[in-house]
């Protein structure tokens, strides 16, 4: 029989823990039955069958598809900033439809439960554990902690679960012990389709023995001297000189761990994102100049990279599996670094020491390639490599990077073929993320990021197989629509709506349009004129030492990665593809994505009309979702005066349970109705359906049924009607609502412009010499207007013109008319 205890491992810095020794958690081995624990509805019982040692243990049985189990310890005093280790034995004999968690419940002095910096719960998730196993769960208590308890809870909708627990021990660790303490890693595995041996053999036959290379080595002076004659070469060399003269900020372990303490991503990532553009610039400058003066800095940075504990962004290593060398896996950042290293190795060739080149290959294999190869061979996907069967940009970006590294670095043709086979499987998942009409719910930025890498992958594979494998042919009808999205989503040639997590200045990257021009010219309405090779393929990031952040200086590159495009576009002639398209052509009068749920209306040939509008339906469970059904962007020329505010600055909470507490993510920060005091709900059932779509030369009319976006029992009807009078340059937005009983109702206009009320219900929005006149009215009661600044981390901050009925209404209409005069 085990003695119930709380282990207190103390130092003078942790005297607060000493106070809690008088209140130890009772009955951690369950030998006293339920003493010290609070049970639930019969799902959690103490019984002999669940004992690991002694006579009794805890058994959780859950066959309830509605709610989970609940078994909680007594509460004891605790202290902020203290690292606690819960050690216990567990046995879950079979896989189930759900999971179970062991939680730390940290509370503040008000009794409120505290969350992690990213807004998530402090929990340790368990799935199948066929044999009894001792596990460690380690957490550091958050700020304002005054107490803790242990909670064992099977997740809602779990069925078929039997889980046994016994012999818990709770320890308060010293700072020295906390440095090396970590939770036991329990990989959650899901099936991944395995390619057949026959298909792998077919792919192997397509591969030459010679490895693919992302461009020629430096000693191909004909190619590099031709690039050196490019006017942009001097700019690149000048940037490289500036990089040499600027002290390099180290990426320390302390900076890496800062995210896990604070949830702030930028502390590490502002420095992290300097590495690639800087070393790319140094490497290309060295190849152009061929004097050796940039080589020492390149070698030093590559050696430092090899010695780093993790190549990931900390936000993608939340359990510190990479950092603690428990499990390596690839993310956006590490796979980008791998591609960068692979490319620099190919270009600089024997300028790099052979020992360094071998070390680089070993690190790429260990950190990136081997974990993926394990999935291909086992058919089991660890949770950390979720992107391999994901449907968003991560899939295309990481698959491109991983496949390119394999094709360039693995001598064995059969193994290269295994990566191609895995790529084919992942590609199918990625393409299901697009709607049938080609719409990308992630928004324009991530369309360019994901689809751009997919097109780069297609060119890479085509080159690496000597033209034998073209991954674009199998899905050509859908891919043509996805390619067309880049044009159809544009309001003007210089403006796209920043729906989802997009920057306000979002626009299709030129590199992506050039790749589309190669393979899908019919998806473009006009020519994409190539700049000089170095001009459009090299990174344009600079570091602002005063602001302590990396500044993006132009849309020249694929956000996190630039070398993939350089290897494809930088050594050829894109003019031959451009010649097949007209020099210029107007955008169509309208674009409609029926399954994506977006309408774009433009002036067409009416030179007197400068208005355009993008109106969004869709649903509230999209990739990079915002609760924004009914949101719209209304522009005068290239200036959006009614604006979707785009993405919030990313933090540890951006993709957690706290996401929709941010105004830019929830409906408060969008130009949509505020109904009965409630915001829009989240989820697939929250949907905006276009019930009317009428398009003509003179007028477009669309109606969205928005009722399903709000969880309000009294709501009978809510529609938004947009009328685009192309001939007279007038846009009208009309919101119609009906309740079963009187309720509060209003709507809003969000803008970055100056907002001025000229008369009751008449407003002027003005920015950058463009002006929008707005008349807001209703015959169903007086309206109240209120301009407030939205709470957000972005700058400048958008403002919200609230438009609300003074009194509750049963049936009402609000009409907003927009003109330029």
Identify the residue ranges that each predicted region occupies.
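CBM-like, beta-strand-rich accessory domains located in the C-terminal region of large
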Residues: 19-21, 335, 544, 549-560, ...
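Extra-cytoplasmic beta-strand recognition segments
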Residues: 26-30, 34, 70-104, 133-141, ...
């Amino acid at each position: 029989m085990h003695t119930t205890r709380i282990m207190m491992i103390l130092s003078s810095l942790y005297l607060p823990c000493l106070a809690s020794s008088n209140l130890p958690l009772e009955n951690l081995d369950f030998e006293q039955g339920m003493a010290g624990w609070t049970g639930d509805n019969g799902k959690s019982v103490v019984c002999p069958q669940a004992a690991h040692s002694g006579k009794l243990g805890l058994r959780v049985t859950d066959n309830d598809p509605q709610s989970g189990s609940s078994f909680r310890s007594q509460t004891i005093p605790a202290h902020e900033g203290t690292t606690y280790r819960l050690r216990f034995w567990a046995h879950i004999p079979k896989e189930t439809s759900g999971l179970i968690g062991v939680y730390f419940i940290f509370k503040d002095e008000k009794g409120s439960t505290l969350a992690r910096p990213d807004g998530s719960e402090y929990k340790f998730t368990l799935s199948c554990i066929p044999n009894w196993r001792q596990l460690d769960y380690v957490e550091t208590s958050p700020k304002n902690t005054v107490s803790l308890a242990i909670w064992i809870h099977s997740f809602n909708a779990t069925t078929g679960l039997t889980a046994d627990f016994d012999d818990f021990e709770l320890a308060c660790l010293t700072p020295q012990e906390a440095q090396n303490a970590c939770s036991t890693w329990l990989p959650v595995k899901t099936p991944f389709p395995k390619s057949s041996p026959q298909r792998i053999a077919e792919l192997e036959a397509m591969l030459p023995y010679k490895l693919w290379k992302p461009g020629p080595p430096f000693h191909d002076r004909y190619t590099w001297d031709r690039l050196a004659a490019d006017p942009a070469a001097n700019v690149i060399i000048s940037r490289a000189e500036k990089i040499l003269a600027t002290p390099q900020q180290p990426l320390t372990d302390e900076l890496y761990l800062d995210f896990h303490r604070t949830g702030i991503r930028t502390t590490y990532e502002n420095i992290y994102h300097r590495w690639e553009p800087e070393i790319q610039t140094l490497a290309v400058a060295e190849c152009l100049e061929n004097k050796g003066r940039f080589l020492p800095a390149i070698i030093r940075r590559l050696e430092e990279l090899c010695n780093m504990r993790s190549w990931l962004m900390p936000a993608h290593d939340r359990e510190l599996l990479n950092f603690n060398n428990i499990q390596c896996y690839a993310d956006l950042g590490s796979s980008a670094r791998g591609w960068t290293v692979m490319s620099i190795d190919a270009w600089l060739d024997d300028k790099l020491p052979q020992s360094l080149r071998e070390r680089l290959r070993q690190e790429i294999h260990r950190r990136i390639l081997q974990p993926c190869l394990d999935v291909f061979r086992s058919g089991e996907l660890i949770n950390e490599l979720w992107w391999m069967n994901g449907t968003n940009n991560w899939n295309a970006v990481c698959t491109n990077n991983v496949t390119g590294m394999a094709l360039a670095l693995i001598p064995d043709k059969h193994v290269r073929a295994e990566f191609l086979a895995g790529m084919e499987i992942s590609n199918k998942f990625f393409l299901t993320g697009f709607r049938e009409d080609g719409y990308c719910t992630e928004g324009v930025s991530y369309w360019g990021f994901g689809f751009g890498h997919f097109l780069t992958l297609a060119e890479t594979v085509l080159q690496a197989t000597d033209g034998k494998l073209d991954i674009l042919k199998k899905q050509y009808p859908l891919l043509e629509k996805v390619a067309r999205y880049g044009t159809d989503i544009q309001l003007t040639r210089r403006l796209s709506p920043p729906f989802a997590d997009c920057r306000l200045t979002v626009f299709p990257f030129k590199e992506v349009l050039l790749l589309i021009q190669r393979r899908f010219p019919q998806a473009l309405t006009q020519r994409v004129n190539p700049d000089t090779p170095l001009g459009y393929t090299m990174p344009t990031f600079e570091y602002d030492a005063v602001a302590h952040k990396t500044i993006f200086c132009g849309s020249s590159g694929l956000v996190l990665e630039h070398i993939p495009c350089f290897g494809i576009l930088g050594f050829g002639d894109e003019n031959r593809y451009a010649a097949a398209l007209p020099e210029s052509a107007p955008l169509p009068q309208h674009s409609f994505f029926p399954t994506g749920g977006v309408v774009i209306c433009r002036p067409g040939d009416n030179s007197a009309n400068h208005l355009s509008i993008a109106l969004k339906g869709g649903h509230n469970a999209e990739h990079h979702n915002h609760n924004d059904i009914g949101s719209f962007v209304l522009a005068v020329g290239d200036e959006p005066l009614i604006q979707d505010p785009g993405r919030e600055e990313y933090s540890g909470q951006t993709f957690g349970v706290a996401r929709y507490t941010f105004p830019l993510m929830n409906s408060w920060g969008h130009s949509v109705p505020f109904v009965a005091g409630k915001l829009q709900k989240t989820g697939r059932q929250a949907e905006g359906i276009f019930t009317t779509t009428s398009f003509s030369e003179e007028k477009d009319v669309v109606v969205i049924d928005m009722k399903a976006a709000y969880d309000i029992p009294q709501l009978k009807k809510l529609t938004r009607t947009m009328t685009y009078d192309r001939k007279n340059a007038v846009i009208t937005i009309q919101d119609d609502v009906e309740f079963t009983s009187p309720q509060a109702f209003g709507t809003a206009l969000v803008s970055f412009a100056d907002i001025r009320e000229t008369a009751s219900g008449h407003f002027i929005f003005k920015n950058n010499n463009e002006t929008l006149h707005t008349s807001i009215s209703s015959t169903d009661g007086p309206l109240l207007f209120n301009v407030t600044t939205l709470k957000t981390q972005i700058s400048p901050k958008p403002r919200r013109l609230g438009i609300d009925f003074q009194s509750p209404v049963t049936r009402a209409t609000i009409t907003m008319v927009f003109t330029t005069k």
